[in-house]
A protein has these predicted regions:
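Short amphipathic alpha-helical "interface-anchor" segments enriched in bulky aromatics
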Residues: 106, 381-420, 424, 428-435
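Secondary-structure capping and boundary motifs in well-ordered enzyme cores
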Residues: 82-87, 194-196, 415-423, 452
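Dynamic "connector" segments at or just before major functional cores
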Residues: 2-219, 226-239, 261, 462-501
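An acidic- and aromatic-residue-enriched active-site/binding cleft used to recognize and process polar
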Residues: 111-112, 175, 205, 215-216, ...
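An anionic, glycine-rich sequence signature occurring as long contiguous blocks
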Residues: 2-5, 9-11, 25-36, 268-396, ...
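C-terminal structured "cap/appendage" subdomains that terminate the fold
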Residues: 434-477
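Short, conserved catalytic/metal-binding motifs centered on acidic residues
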Residues: 60, 91-92, 106, 124-126, ...
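Domain-level cores of phosphate- or acyl-group-handling catalytic modules
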Residues: 220-276
Length: 501
């Protein structure tokens, strides 16, 4: 970082710290927010944008070779008058980085001359043109777009330290992408009565990247055609990571494929509590069951405080609602060979001792079983359960795809067109992860990977800038400040110095 830039940051930091320093205030006669004589003026010389971080994002995308990769692999336009395929894809993704939630929001950027100058564009596609672009996709085109993203993803991975490649954990799950539309092709009613599409999502736990997203009719079961996408995910990671894990719920316990997956990876899947498994668990002697002790949610580092009243629990008791309370949990393991497998696998049984309550009355006790099947022989039964439960974090990734980048808003009128938009919108989520992986600050790297998309926008994208076009460059002159700017500049310099091959 240049000395001048460092001095400016240090000065701004000192000023805001001085302003926010705790003071012994006297009683104030007026509210703190007392601005009244407010005027607006138009600056005739300078042009600015609110999302100044888009320059660093665009440079990273360009340096990674992603733009050339799209134009070489995805062919939807016979002639480029004037846009290329990469222009459309990035325009849709950058709309999300500018806070857009719908195709119509593109028009705001299109009318902003400073935004166009910031990206070096004469003009960008309008919302109607983008809708037409999405309708041009076939299933093969969407798959090729995902593979193009994955090739760029691998180049970003290749810049990581050796420790990054010790283990890859792939989370697999399905979700319903609801829509209020009535004329969208491919939509159907799901198992829970919602109209929309059934989406398969495969992501990597460490980086939260969406590796594959598959759009299907709303009545499709979660596991439909999932085996081929799991195979593609294994192809993506197996050559780079020393150990690969698959993790999913009972819907993805596809025993027909276990023997094949066993040769390439470790896996832990939930498995339905069928009568044969329950009978095996019941036949195991009580002395073989081991207690499952859950880890505390947090560790008290100072002084333990008195817990506040549990309002939810009090209301449940007062109104006589039925409540299921866990009394104890025990685990045991045994070998089991599913009918469609040639190999024998390890099953961990979790037995929950429950009490069914209504108000202050304990109605009866109940025993429920949960089963997990794995090809790993090293973890303890308790660790298998903990590992399987960590899959719940995948729900947070799906929530961010739904409400962070709005990838499942379904703006088009066709299943494949909506699939294409889903993949492109998820590209914004993936770019966030790539930016985090290229951040020199190791602590901040982890924070970015765990950040919600909204916070990432507010921290690294929503940086007000003047846009100045010179003869050979585009200058983003920052006029705002936050305490992440030092790391922002370090990451920008790291991106400029990287050479992708």
């Amino acid at each position: 970082m240049k000395k001048v830039k460092h001095k400016v940051l240090a000065r701004r930091k000192r000023k805001i710290e001085k302003r926010l320093r705790r003071k012994n205030w006297t009683n104030q006669p007026k509210p703190m927010l007392k601005a009244s004589n407010i005027h607006y003026q138009m600056d005739g010389r300078h042009k600015g944008i609110a999302y100044g971080g888009i320059g660093a994002i665009h440079l990273m995308v360009k340096r990674s070779g992603f733009i050339k990769e799209i134009d070489n692999a995805v062919h939807l336009l016979k002639r480029h008058l004037p846009y290329h395929e990469s222009d459309h894809v990035l325009n849709l993704a950058y709309n999300i980085f500018a806070g857009g939630t719908r195709l119509q929001d593109i028009e705001l950027q299109r009318q902003d001359e400073a935004w166009l100058d910031a990206l070096g564009a004469e003009v960008i596609p309008d919302p109607t043109t983008e809708g037409d672009f999405l309708r041009r996709f076939s299933e093969d085109d969407v798959i090729e777009l995902m593979e193009t993203i994955n090739r760029t993803r691998q180049r970003v991975w290749d810049k990581q330290p050796k420790s990054f490649f010790e283990k890859a954990i792939l989370n697999i799950d399905g979700t319903i992408a609801e829509t209020t539309g009535e004329c969208k092709k491919g939509m159907d009613i799901s198992y829970n009565g919602l109209w929309g599409y059934s989406t398969l999502a495969i992501s990597m736990a460490q980086t939260r990247e969406a590796l594959y997203l598959v759009n299907r009719p709303g009545n499709a079961p979660s596991h439909l055609d999932s085996a081929q996408w799991i195979d593609r995910s294994l192809d993506l990671v197996c050559d780079r990571f020393k150990q690969v894990w698959l993790r999913g719920d009972t819907d993805f316990s596809l025993t027909k494929h276990f023997d094949r997956w066993d040769e390439r990876s470790k896996f832990v899947f939930g498995i339905d509590a069928r009568q044969n498994l329950i009978a095996i668990a019941d036949s195991i002697a009580e002395r073989q069951w081991e207690p499952l002790l859950r880890k505390p949610r947090y560790e008290v580092k100072t002084k333990k405080r008195k817990r506040p009243e549990n309002v939810k629990e009090r209301i449940v008791k007062e109104r006589g609602f039925e409540n299921i309370r866990t009394v104890s949990e025990h685990v045991v393991e045994f070998d089991y060979r599913p009918v469609k497998c040639k190999k024998t696998y390890r099953v961990v049984a979790l037995r929950k001792n429950l009490t069914i309550e209504k108000g202050d009355l304990a109605l009866f006790d109940d025993i429920r079983y949960f089963f997990y099947i794995t090809n790993d022989r090293l973890m303890t039964p308790q660790e298998v359960v903990y590992f399987a439960n960590e899959r719940c974090d995948h729900e947070n990734d799906i929530e961010q795809l739904k409400n962070g980048v709005n990838a499942m808003r379904m703006p088009a009128d066709d299943l494949v067109a909506n699939w294409a938009y889903m993949v492109i919108a998820a590209l914004a989520w993936n770019i966030k992860a790539w930016y985090g992986l290229l951040t020199p600050n190791k602590v901040l790297r982890y924070q970015i990977l765990r950040m919600e998309f909204k916070r990432f926008l507010n921290t690294f994208l929503r940086i007000p800038c003047h846009i100045i076009k010179t003869g050979r460059s585009i200058v983003y002159r920052l006029v705002g400040y936050n305490h992440y700017l030092k790391d922002f500049f370090r990451t920008f310099q790291a991106i400029k110095a990287l050479g992708f091959t």
